[in-house]
Amino acid sequence: MKKVLFVASESVPFIKTGGLADVVGSLPKYFDKNKYDVRVMLPKYMCMKDEWKDKLSYRLHFYMDLNWRQQYVGILELQHEGITFYFIDNEYYFNGPKPYGDIAYDIEKFAFFSKAALSALPLLDFRPDIIHCHDWQTGLVPIYLDNFRYNNEFFRGIKTVITIHNLKFQGIWDKKTVMDITGLPAYYFSPDKLEAYDNANYLKGGIVYADRVTTVSSSYAEEIKTPFYGEKLEGLMQARANCLSGIVNGIDYDDFNPATDTNIARTYSVENFRKEKVKNKMALQEELGLERDPHRMMIGIVSRLTDQKGFDLIDCVMDELCQDAVQIVVLGTGDERYENMFRHFAWKYPDKVSAQIYYSEPMSHKIYASCDAFLMPSLFEPCGLSQLMSLRYGTVPIVRETGGLKDTVEAYNEYEKTGTGFSFTNYNAHEMLATVRYAEQIYYDKKRDWNKIVERGMEKDFSWKNSAKLYEELYENM
């Protein structure tokens, strides 16, 4: 039986800030239990909900050197849905109100976490065959592992995988400070290892030292080899091309199931969505104070409100879009500029725009279930989960062809009667508007074709089962 340890900075249901948590919390459940023993290592944040903290059981503790500092490391454990979760406890590092804070503090916090995760393994009597790291927060794990191998036989032969969920975030800080924090030999701080442009770069170090590198979609794996998407690491990604692969994320089909979802007004399935889905729309219109009209096309947006997500395009054409027979429902938080932008349009067009500037999991389910279309005009999108959720709920995605959006949404072809959504290529506001209006035309004038698009989307399988099989193949070939 192969032993695999996931090391990550967040995981559902314990702590979540983005899609990384969904991957780490969901994927381990879908591996073949007869062939894989998959466990997960996380920080024990003080901001975790008490309902989870109260369930943790103490395993052990020890003290660890972090260069000249000596730090307490506590290990707690929880069995959840058949998976063993280990939590690394240290109140000095993990006592903040949020999992992440200022990068100056996070740099030391995740150096501690990476070293502690490895140092705990001999004491836990768990020797993984593969350690699967996620994003820059665990980028030092392959480097510490390389360093530990020289003096400790326990760590020899352990392989590593690092998954890049978003190359934009790399964990970059002053090289001398990182040398002092980590206690790693100067040997590791050269341009072919941890150093990048005179700074230390955690993610770069992880990519250099990991045995395999994955991203969260095939298209994104190709895109990050180019200067536009490569975030100054395109040369490294080209050099590691033979070890680089893209595996699309999935979603938990038990959590996201319109036939059993308790968050929505009316459950439905691919067999009866034509009659039942519209009842969710009318309930949401009433809840949000929009004009009640079962025939009005409703477009949803559930997102972090940041530049990456293409909201500057929406800003350019929102006035034009609001002249059409549509309603737009927005849920999310982020940059103040975009929060205020959507508040402004909700004030200007109260019957057509609803801006919910917060995040709520039940409200997100209501939007997926109620809307007719879902808009994602991202500048770049490593994978994206929202379009998978919208397909699951029969809400037709309108996306820009980039990264995971390109891989998971097949553009509608009215002549061949194929496709699960609508897409545009260039990062251009009026190209996006033309695509939205094309979707409106099909919705209003060719309702039978629209329902077939919905049907094809609902019949697609983007569950974790498919992703887990591809990760199993990756592990077997290491």
Language-model features and meaning:
Residues 1-478:
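Catalytic cores of nucleotide-sugar-dependent glycosyltransferases that transfer UDP/GDP/TDP-activated
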